[in-house]
Amino acid sequence: MANSPQAKKRARQNDKARAHNASLRSMVRTYLKKVVAAIEAGDAEAAKKAYVAAVPVIDRMADKGIIHKNKAARHKSRLNAQIKGLAA
């Protein structure tokens, strides 16, 4: 339990940041799910559109430290490979 005023404020700030970061992580997962759903449906055009929409969001969250940059790169690489597999 935070006792000093400084520790109490930090605890409040941490709670606020945790809630905000959770919503941002959820947004990234939603964009990823849209791409995966289009891939599973076999719709290459929709998958490509969803991927193009997801990439800036993934990159932005990696820049902010919401997700690790390597995780962002891994997601983008795997999704792009799956989309290219649909077209072939």
From Swiss-Prot:
This is Small ribosomal subunit protein bS20. The keyword RNA-binding applies. Belongs to the bacterial ribosomal protein bS20 family. NCBIfam families: S20. Residues 1-23 are annotated as: Disordered. One of its GO terms (molecular function) is structural constituent of ribosome. The keyword RNA-binding applies. GO terms for cellular component: cytosol; small ribosomal subunit. It comes from Teredinibacter turnerae (strain ATCC 39867 / T7901). Keywords: Ribonucleoprotein, Ribosomal protein, RNA-binding, rRNA-binding. Binds directly to 16S ribosomal RNA. PANTHER family: 30S RIBOSOMAL PROTEIN S20 (PTHR33398), SMALL RIBOSOMAL SUBUNIT PROTEIN BS20C (PTHR33398:SF1). It comes from the Bacteria. InterPro entries: Ribosomal_bS20 (IPR002583), Ribosomal_bS20_sf (IPR036510). GO terms for biological process: translation.
